[in-house]
Amino acid sequence: MQFVSWATLLTLLVRDLAEMGSPDAAAAVRKDRLHPRQVKLLETLSEYEIVSPIRVNALGEPFPTNVHFKRTRRSINSATDPWPAFASSSSSSTSSQAHYRLSAFGQQFLFNLTANAGFIAPLFTVTLLGTPGVNQTKFYSEEEAELKHCFYKGYVNTNSEHTAVISLCSGMLGTFRSHDGDYFIEPLQSMDEQEDEEEQNKPHIIYRRSAPQREPSTGRHACDTSEHKNRHSKDKKKTRARKWGERINLAGDVAALNSGLATEAFSAYGNKTDNTREKRTHRRTKRFLSYPRFVEVLVVADNRMVSYHGENLQHYILTLMSIVASIYKDPSIGNLINIVIVNLIVIHNEQDGPSISFNAQTTLKNFCQWQHSKNSPGGIHHDTAVLLTRQDICRAHDKCDTLGLAELGTICDPYRSCSISEDSGLSTAFTIAHELGHVFNMPHDDNNKCKEEGVKSPQHVMAPTLNFYTNPWMWSKCSRKYITEFLDTGYGECLLNEPESRPYPLPVQLPGILYNVNKQCELIFGPGSQVCPYMMQCRRLWCNNVNGVHKGCRTQHTPWADGTECEPGKHCKYGFCVPKEMDVPVTDGSWGSWSPFGTCSRTCGGGIKTAIRECNRPEPKNGGKYCVGRRMKFKSCNTEPCLKQKRDFRDEQCAHFDGKHFNINGLLPNVRWVPKYSGILMKDRCKLFCRVAGNTAYYQLRDRVIDGTPCGQDTNDICVQGLCRQAGCDHVLNSKARRDKCGVCGGDNSSCKTVAGTFNTVHYGYNTVVRIPAGATNIDVRQHSFSGETDDDNYLALSSSKGEFLLNGNFVVTMAKREIRIGNAVVEYSGSETAVERINSTDRIEQELLLQVLSVGKLYNPDVRYSFNIPIEDKPQQFYWNSHGPWQACSKPCQGERKRKLVCTRESDQLTVSDQRCDRLPQPGHITEPCGTDCDLRWHVASRSECSAQCGLGYRTLDIYCAKYSRLDGKTEKVDDGFCSSHPKPSNREKCSGECNTGGWRYSAWTECSKSCDGGTQRRRAICVNTRNDVLDDSKCTHQEKVTIQRCSEFPCPQWKSGDWSECLVTCGKGHKHRQVWCQFGEDRLNDRMCDPETKPTSMQTCQQPECASWQAGPWGQCSVTCGQGYQLRAVKCIIGTYMSVVDDNDCNAATRPTDTQDCELPSCHPPPAAPETRRSTYSAPRTQWRFGSWTPCSATCGKGTRMRYVSCRDENGSVADESACATLPRPVAKEECSVTPCGQWKALDWSSCSVTCGQGRATRQVMCVNYSDHVIDRSECDQDYIPETDQDCSMSPCPQRTPDSGLAQHPFQNEDYRPRSASPSRTHVLGGNQWRTGPWGACSSTCAGGSQRRVVVCQDENGYTANDCVERIKPDEQRACESGPCPQWAYGNWGECTKLCGGGIRTRLVVCQRSNGERFPDLSCEILDKPPDREQCNTHACPHDAAWSTGPWSSCSVSCGRGHKQRNVYCMAKDGSHLESDYCKHLAKPHGHRKCRGGRCPKWKAGAWSQCSVSCGRGVQQRHVGCQIGTHKIARETECNPYTRPESERDCQGPRCPLYTWRAEEWQECTKTCGEGSRYRKVVCVDDNKNEVHGARCDVSKRPVDRESCSLQPCEYVWITGEWSECSVTCGKGYKQRLVSCSEIYTGKENYEYSYQTTINCPGTQPPSVHPCYLRDCPVSATWRVGNWGSCSVSCGVGVMQRSVQCLTNEDQPSHLCHTDLKPEERKTCRNVYNCELPQNCKEVKRLKGASEDGEYFLMIRGKLLKIFCAGMHSDHPKEYVTLVHGDSENFSEVYGHRLHNPTECPYNGSRRDDCQCRKDYTAAGFSSFQKIRIDLTSMQIITTDLQFARTSEGHPVPFATAGDCYSAAKCPQGRFSINLYGTGLSLTESARWISQGNYAVSDIKKSPDGTRVVGKCGGYCGKCTPSSGTGLEVRVL
């Protein structure tokens, strides 16, 4: 406590004053002990006093010393105590009022104060981020202070005109008014800022307020106005106009275009940000109404603000926000806007807040992202966030004149509703208000948008600069217009939710009272700054620096704060010095009268007139509320249709801009604008989008179209004030008139008739179908393809009556969908690329149309079906009342009557028309009949309340309603009470009697359930007992419900279920049909043994189809010729039945039809004699022709194959005729060769060189498989059986042999200068120094038989040089004969078999070169020319022409992964298609029947990294994920991998030694009682080795010392206390009276004893009786036992009990005790669940209880219901549970869509997905995963969406369950999809399941079925996605 230090300071001050001897001596106070801020204050004061306020009560009496106002702390008390600041030791209640007294300046001041929190929200919260720094130690030194209760407002000395505004936290801080002027008071602060808020008599400074003297100004500096529109600017070192700005919205209007902003605003429309509005509890309601708006604001102050303002920060910020709130209360804004601060976040450490730098744009972006993270649904919600910083923010590196920054129109966007403001003193409030204006979509007052509103000079809140002419308290007309339109258009829905009601009123105090004019200068220009004297007061605040008043007065053009004193008795208000108003009344606004309706917006076609009213009778003043209610109303005008030749109204508005190019690149000066309809978002339909004629580029030329403009081409709705409003075809606002099928607005379909027909005649070219007359409506034409394919060579066409084609003319067909405008009508065409080609239009056609069909190609018959409505001719029509209309509803639910409705009918076609047609005709009587005859209506008593008196007479209420009693089943159904109005309703109140007993029912165990399933009952007995378990009469327990019977086993029994019968397996004759039969329990299939086999339905039964038809062939007819070659015919008929009835040939199998023609040959003919002329026969044969079908697919996928088609002879009627009738015509080919793509061919490159240079070696070559373009392909694409050889033998010349002596090669020397270096020649002949020298013998010239050898012989001298004079006769031989053995000869074997039986085959034999001993030699060793042939032709005779090999299609690969093979059938076939033996085709090369193939990649186990050890010390486990995977990304089921090679997923690990934890017990506390047995406690904690306290779970629980023990002191004394007897419990018969009997402890010092419930054994003696019998008179009433229904079983499994109520009641349903107890029915019985308690509840229990180790489906008991769950990983210790999805992966999938629009600002095709979109498919995060099973956590009942073990990713990356997204468009056009279908699983999603959108422009559209089993969603953005909320997860429940 700091009282001593304050007392010392006060003593020193008093001593200093005494030494000075006068009041003026106060200036000589020891100021070195005061805070510097107060030192400066005292220096400016002419007089002041030091006082100590005293808190008093309302009578002026001092409070006790322990009562003092203090600043409250956030604690649990604040939740229950509305004013915790007042502490009292007594039991007096706290109050919101406070009274203080002080003496100063010779006067007594008595303060009467009332709490006043102003603008602070009831749940206002202050959040501190980080630890205060060294220089911030005084900022919330202990815990955050609650300032809401600090603010008080009241009056002085009982005079309400003498206002006081005081903050009572840490002393009295504020101002008050007296008869002699205004006073200020504040507590003294010491040098170190210490003060004691608990101290009562704290010294305060009190001083008068006087106007400062000022000197004239020397002049003003010029203001610099920047054109930059993006930021606010501020002063630097010289006077400068301050700039405010905004971030420009990308879609401007025409005014912005004309000002040159088109480049930025129209670079590409659609880049406009499409804000995602936060969905709040309020839905969009009616527009153009003024609603109260509540702007919940988060204010964030950075660490620089903390450093600058210190402990005063919160006060300062609340003062700023009070000014902002008052600005938004000004009536000039035209709306009721309430600014409410809900949260203040103070950032001590820079790292804990958003990144703040000098760059304003970056800071805003960082702050917006940061604040969104603080706006969680479960936390403190805010609508917008404001950042206050002392950081000098800049719009560029060298342009730091920015004061604030915000984006336009983002108030309800949770990601972008934020702004930043640089703190510059109290004028910061105007910056905050300005930036919030941008958030409300207000432009600057000098913006081109505002010129239309007549704002010529920016002088209001949204002025771009704050200068001398600015009025920052009021709003311009432009600002009012834009915020009103913004809110009326529905962009402020999040502001409709009102914060919780405030506990007290919130008036606003003026900031100038809290901050004097010098303090305002310091806040702007720093410490030491003071107001410049002699300047104009209030209008602008001029401040000087510390160097003197004449050296640098400067201003930021901000006015003095409201409430700043300017002259005696006056203060500043809105920049003017005005008299102080003592008690300004608050005036709420009220609506004025409606203005007359204005001019019509259109001259025809439905315009709008508008009337408005202003909030001006009166206007809101002095903080009053703005009007609430409708401000505009509309009515239709000029609704008559426009002339047909008049241009479209939207077209006229676009044409207004013809010739205006707005400086957009690429637009010509004569540009022409036309309306843009398609591709515009629904919410933008009332903006004027125009397209450049002849181009696709479009732009927004106006913010809104003219009122009355249709919203689109396909609707009657019209635009009003930029919103699409409902209108009818009569062009009247809010009309529901629609055109009937005849095109008549509001018609009854009676003015037209329907014309319908078909057309199927074919002729080449254009064929006329029908003429559609002018005036036709509802045209629908469809052309069905004959084969269901899109390509059938028939196309619809339209032409005008003049023959001009409108669609598909001149043999040019439109394949894509298109629209055709014919006058004012729009005709839609589906395009020719559809199986059903369609032309349709609902509009009235004003000209005649000719419908045609274009037939080309193969001239298939068209199938055209058309219908349209045409006006009825003007002849009179007859109408009559038809009494046989539909039955109307029954007049009553029971015993009522219903009648047929009379309908007006047209006689000509019996069409029902409007009743107006029959108005003047007499109506016949109604046809009636009784209805609801199977039930009755009566009043039903549903229930009775308990008796109002527990003892004696009372009453109870009855729940009575009108009920429908069914006579059939006796059920009761509640209906409206009005149906029972014919019967008097019984009273809902009846008398009753309380039994005055304290008894209760004691039950026996429930009996076993009477049925094991399908609902049985259980019973139990009930006995009435008292608290001592004494048995009482049952009448003593009638106040409690007796439950002795209950229902049990209410789940259904397993039942046989059967599917639909299949079709009969035969089409004729007798066959069978099948159906599935299974055992089902709920939604689950069980094993058949679970159902009764005796009742199993049959699964197969016989079926009888019509008798089968067969072919019957007649005898052959005569040969067609009398000689030579001819043919014979016979009749072939299709017959059926015993009587052999002839039926159509289509009823017989065409494949088995016998031939009806054959060749015949008679003797050859002799040449006929020449005849002069032959006469032509006049017989005309029937006209026949060959018809053929389409070719089948080629039998081979590559290379040569075959294809076939159906060929049939048809007569002129198209019926099948005998082929003989077409014999004279060439028969079309029915089978031919085909080739889809060439197969791969083997390509062999050149042989390599031989591997040796002599002798035998090997040569190799490369063999590749290439396609038709010679590109290398996989070898499996080529025939493996015909692969060329890749290596072969090769022979080189024989290798030389080495001699044993020299090792030199035996060949003659070729070089005459050769000189041996070593050995001497073998033979030497010497002559005169010259000698012959010989070389070695060469090889034998022949390898066999006789040959010769040669050697070199040379003449050399003694030196070895060549000489010429050697003796010739002794010259050695140069050649000699040699013998190498016998030569090899050609040997050959026998010829092999011929490769073909005919047509020229090949046969081969073995031919080798060898010696007689069998030694083989290369072929070159024998004479090649003599080599016998090793192959020759054979069987060269011609083969039959009608046999060939035929191949079937290749089978699928034999393996699903890895290498395998596939095969096909190869068979020999005759020309007529019949099969032959293979020998007939042996002469042909047989195609291969086998080939290699390769499946996908085989799944393999993939093990992840080991996790960290499960413990930080000791022995633990490590785990890793082991999954079955295909490739690197695709996840497979674990069953697809080999379970025996699965890597381990868990292993042991060893951590460091664990620390030792022990229990530590502290000292015992005092005993809880002063007498008798009590208890005492002590604290027992767990500590570590260092004696530090840790969590108790770390110590051994078994060794924990006791923390409680009994303590026994002196015995207590007790006494019996009895009460008065009650009245008798009954009015007749035997009853009893009661009284209270209590054992009470004797307390010392108390005169009276209290009733208590001490145990009775403590009291001495016998307990006095508490019940006494009584008898008043006999009861004449008889009674019977009545039983209720059995309750539910007490256990979910095993044996339990169930109960029912048994009551003794009189005939009047009154409780009685006259029933015979021996006849009482049982009230309690045992029950047994059909399933025993050993049913497993998870897969781990399945493994433990059943010993199962196989993965599969098992029944688990989940939340009381048996469900089928798939258990996976049963071989491991931790199996997992999965839910098998009954509807499979077709309805359970997740997708991240991969396409991205080239122009992401569009949403083409109205959001539909099209593969032909203008897209690129490059989104890297795309993927598609489908799910067969999903994992479930049975503990939390949550779906684990990221488990993909049973998911199949067919495209891209895996996508978690229930997740979707895309990167498709930024225009709310989601394409990513997910689907959940839990039907049949027994589970459904809970209501808490939520999805959140993430990413940029993220949007989601999620639809849930009512039962939660089905969810479908579309999500996306640019780029965005939706995932289940992490807060709620994907929780499921058991159905």
UniProtKB/Swiss-Prot annotation:
Biased composition (Basic and acidic residues): 217-228
Top-level enzyme category: hydrolase
Tissue and organ distribution: Highly expressed in all fetal tissues. Expressed in a number of adult tissues with highest expression in heart, placenta and skeletal muscle.
Residue numbers binding Zn(2+): 223, 434, 438, 444
The TSP type-1 domain, residue ranges: 588-643, 878-936, 939-997, 998-1049, 1052-1109, 1110-1166, 1182-1240, 1241-1296, 1328-1379, 1382-1440, 1441-1494, 1497-1555, 1556-1611, 1612-1676, 1677-1734
Record text about domains: The spacer domain and the TSP type-1 domains are important for a tight interaction with the extracellular matrix. The ancillary domains, including the TSRs domain, are required for specific extracellular localization and for its versicanase and aggrecanase activities.
Protein name: A disintegrin and metalloproteinase with thrombospondin motifs 9
Species assigned in the record: Homo sapiens (Human)
Gene: ADAMTS9
